[in-house]
A protein has these predicted regions:
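Beta/alpha (TIM)-barrel catalytic core signal, keyed to glycine-rich beta->alpha loops juxtaposed to Asp/Glu
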Residues: 1-137
Length: 137
């Protein structure tokens, strides 16, 4: 439903240059989701993603089932790395906004961002992320 609203708003108000939306690996089909990001890309609009950690729910108190799924990856990542890299892996995201709570947290975000780039996930990593998202839902 939210995708319809996004399209309607962008059609009615064509002066937008950038759009902010919530997105994480468990939000692919929530609100405008990945379909919304792709639509923005097709319109040559910038996209800002906020809250990729879902208020830290994706990095704190991780269930053992999720940890076991992450362990199937050839590259070992922290939950923070999985969440941020999922966003940076996309070619339709221009900026990421997240709550930074400490200097140490900022340093960790910078370190992850410095190793992140578009299309860096392997097919196996994409399958793992899909499985993790399903497990959360």
């Amino acid at each position: 439903m939210e995708m319809d609203y996004l399209v309607e708003i962008l059609d009615d108000y064509p002066k937008f240059e950038i759009v902010t939306s919530q997105m994480s690996y468990i939000d692919e089909h929530y609100k405008a989701g990945t379909q919304g990001l792709e639509h923005l890309k097709n319109l040559n609009l910038g996209s800002i993603v906020k809250n990729p950690l879902r208020n830290n729910c994706l990095i704190e108190n991780i269930p053992i089932e999720i940890k076991e799924l992450f362990d199937y990856s050839d590259i070992k990542r922290t939950p923070l790395e999985w969440a941020l890299q999922y966003i940076w892996n996309r070619d339709d995201v221009h900026c990421l906004i997240n709550n930074i709570k400490s200097l140490e947290n900022l340093k960790e975000h910078i370190e992850v961002a410095s190793r992140s780039y578009v299309n860096s996930f392997s097919e196996n990593d994409c399958e793992i992320i899909r499985a993790v998202a399903i497990e959360y839902w």
